[in-house]
Amino acid sequence: MTAPLTLALSKGRIFEETLPLLAAAGVQVTEDPETSRKLILPTTNPDLRVIIVRASDVPTYVEYGAADFGVAGKDVLVEHGGSGLYQPIDLNIARCRMSVAVSAGFDYASAVRQGARLRVATKYVETAREHFAAKGVHVDLIKLYGSMELAPLVGLADAIVDLVSSGGTLKANNLVEVEEIMAISSRLVVNQAALKLKRAALKPILDAFERASQNGG
């Protein structure tokens, strides 16, 4: 008996916005990860299962073959580096942007012009390092895992690098966006070995995902 294909997803927005793409492939996930304690979820296709992992872990599960394919944000993939992954499709879901933000009273442009060394809090350390290095801005990076908006408010950092959707959370915490680093959307990523060895099983699903993403779900 052939092992089922394994799709790695994270809870929340990416999971919810992937469901219509799965539906386009004729597949439904039969349990809700928000209410189920299970981390391996069956689908209506006996040859496909879904595993629920942290968003930042999706590329690792796919890279090492624990999952055949997955959906991950560009932010996560840039930090990961993309080793061992084939990235055939931008799914155009979970869209947002990665930006630099500061407290409303902080003159970021002036600090940069004067060559000030800035403390920047982020969980996207590699991306932030490359961005500021390319602009010639001197920074000390502080790795945080959440509540990024708090860092400037309590004097931990001069700026943050984080994902922004509507900007409502920034505004609520008296922060302003001063620089966009990149536009973010979620991509389909495929294990390179699986693409060769399981191509017949994978291709119909990948094709359905691509069609659905181009048609807006």
Swiss-Prot record:
Stored PROSITE patterns: ATP_P_PHORIBOSYLTR (PS01316)
Chain's gene name: hisG
CDD domains linked to this entry: PBP2_HisGs (cd13595)
Enzyme Commission number(s): 2.4.2.17
Record-given protein name: ATP phosphoribosyltransferase
Substrates-to-products reaction catalysed: 1-(5-phospho-beta-D-ribosyl)-ATP + diphosphate = 5-phospho-alpha-D-ribose 1-diphosphate + ATP
SUPFAM superfamilies found in the cross-reference section: Periplasmic binding protein-like II
Originating organism: Burkholderia orbicola (strain MC0-3)
Superkingdom as given in the UniProt entry: Bacteria
GO biological process assignments: L-histidine biosynthetic process
